[in-house]
């Protein structure tokens, strides 16, 4: 049964999506939402192929984008900061606030958060969690605004849909830019915000075309290539 179901789905994708065509952004987002077949509200993911050589240290592309329309995800935040900031961090909506006590919980396997923010004075504590946070991409970093004396703004950014990005070994940036029930216009606005920040993060050493290919998909759906002139 499983196999037939899959091929039926694949057949529908093949009928609806022309893999050789690049789509107008709004048309592409409409199509992705139409093809989302899962029972849950799927995320809309974007993959952007950059003209960089990621093996070279002067061509690393990383940063963060605040999505103007949010991501539709509930973001849980852990903040490492001293007593002076703790009350303000809790008030700003952080689920977990602490220092050595929070570090001990994380070391013990507590990972009920999606973003970690640290004030500079907490880095001695956070530094010891590198083996736990690093592999999950949760290590706070000044470049993405997650190591900052202003933890309140960082919490608000995270909660309002800040997305961190980093080009992988193949020079591709993956990011979630919303949910399938977002209007195409809102998804396009989110994507444009990401592209703007990627352009700002362009390494001086990168040669040739920087934005090579932009494709979108839902969690379980096929990839759709967007025509960049429509963005």
UniProtKB/Swiss-Prot annotation:
Single GO BP term: regulation of translation
Domain of life according to the entry: Bacteria
Entries under InterPro entries matching the protein: Ribosom_uL1_bac-type (IPR005878), Ribosomal_uL1 (IPR002143), Ribosomal_uL1-like (IPR023674), Ribosomal_uL1/biogenesis (IPR028364), Ribosomal_uL1_3-a/b-sand (IPR016095), Ribosomal_uL1_CS (IPR023673)
One Pfam family linked to the record: Ribosomal_L1
PANTHER family for this protein: 54S RIBOSOMAL PROTEIN L1, MITOCHONDRIAL, LARGE RIBOSOMAL SUBUNIT PROTEIN UL1M
Family: Belongs to the universal ribosomal protein uL1 family.
Role noted for this protein: Binds directly to 23S rRNA. The L1 stalk is quite mobile in the ribosome, and is involved in E site tRNA release. Protein L1 is also a translational repressor protein, it controls the translation of the L11 operon by binding to its mRNA.
HAMAP family for the chain: Ribosomal_uL1_B
UniProt subunit comment: Part of the 50S ribosomal subunit.
Protein name: Large ribosomal subunit protein uL1
Organism from which the protein derives: Hydrogenovibrio crunogenus (strain DSM 25203 / XCL-2)
The gene coding this protein: rplA
């Amino acid at each position: 049964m499983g196999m037939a179901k899959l091929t039926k789905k694949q057949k529908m994708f093949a009928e609806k999506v022309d893999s050789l065509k690049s789509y107008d952004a709004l048309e592409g987002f409409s199509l992705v939402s139409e093809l989302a077949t899962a029972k849950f509200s799927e995320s809309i993911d974007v993959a952007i192929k950059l003209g960089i050589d990621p093996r070279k240290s002067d061509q690393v592309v990383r940063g963060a984008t605040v999505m103007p329309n949010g991501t539709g995800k509930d973001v849980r935040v852990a903040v490492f900061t001293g007593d002076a900031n703790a009350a303000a961090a809790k008030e700003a909506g952080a689920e977990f606030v602490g220092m050595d006590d929070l570090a001990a919980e994380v070391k013990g396997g507590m990972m009920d958060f999606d973003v970690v923010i640290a004030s500079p004075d907490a880095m001695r504590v956070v530094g010891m969690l590198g083996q736990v946070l690093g592999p999950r991409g949760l290590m706070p970093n000044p470049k993405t605004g997650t190591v900052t004396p202003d933890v309140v703004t960082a919490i608000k950014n995270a909660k309002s849909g800040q997305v961190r990005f980093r080009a992988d070994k193949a020079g591709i940036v993956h990011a979630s830019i919303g949910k399938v029930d977002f209007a195409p216009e809102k998804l396009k606005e989110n994507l444009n915000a990401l592209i703007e920040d990627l352009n700002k993060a362009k390494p001086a050493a990168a040669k040739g075309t920087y934005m090579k290919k932009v494709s979108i998909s839902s969690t379980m759906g096929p990839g759709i290539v967007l025509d960049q002139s429509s963005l």
